[in-house]
Design a protein with these regions (language model features):
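Phosphate/nucleotide-binding beta-alpha loop and adjacent structural elements of enzyme active sites
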Residues: 1-128
Length: 128
């Protein structure tokens, strides 16, 4: 989080706001293993909230890369996605998480989204 805050400070004009929360289907504290994202193995607690709890509007694009937590994130974002109809770019590792991918596809289709394009492990979904 603080790395991104530092990077964002370089830009004098920005429409980006950073919050120190993980996204889920409910408010809770989760244990996170950071060894896949930093050079040394590290663990820590992350406060989680739903995307819907922020009451965001005018969202055009959502990028999701949460390594297996896509289903809780999408379930906690249903209202936001329905009200804003953003383009969704979601990392889906089909070779490693077939059950998660199937559930994500079901949620996205239920919300009126249609698969558009795949590049490596990222997929683009648009409101149909």
């Amino acid at each position: 989080f603080y790395l991104f805050c530092g990077l964002l400070a370089v830009f004098t004009e920005s429409n980006v706001t950073l919050w120190p929360y993980g996204l889920s289907d409910r408010e809770h504290t989760a244990q996170q293993d950071f060894n896949s994202t930093v050079l040394k193995e590290e663990k820590g607690d992350i406060d989680c909230r739903t995307l819907d709890s922020f009451g965001l509007t005018n969202i055009d694009f959502v990028k999701i890369d949460v390594d297996g937590f896509e289903v809780p994130l999408l379930n906690g974002a249903r209202e936001t996605l329905t009200n804003n109809n953003p383009v969704i770019n979601i990392e889906m590792k089909r070779d490693k998480r077939a059950v998660v991918v199937t559930k994500c596809e079901s949620i996205l289709k239920d919300l009126g989204y249609k698969f558009q394009k795949r590049t490596k492990s990222d997929e683009v979904w648009l409101k149909s």
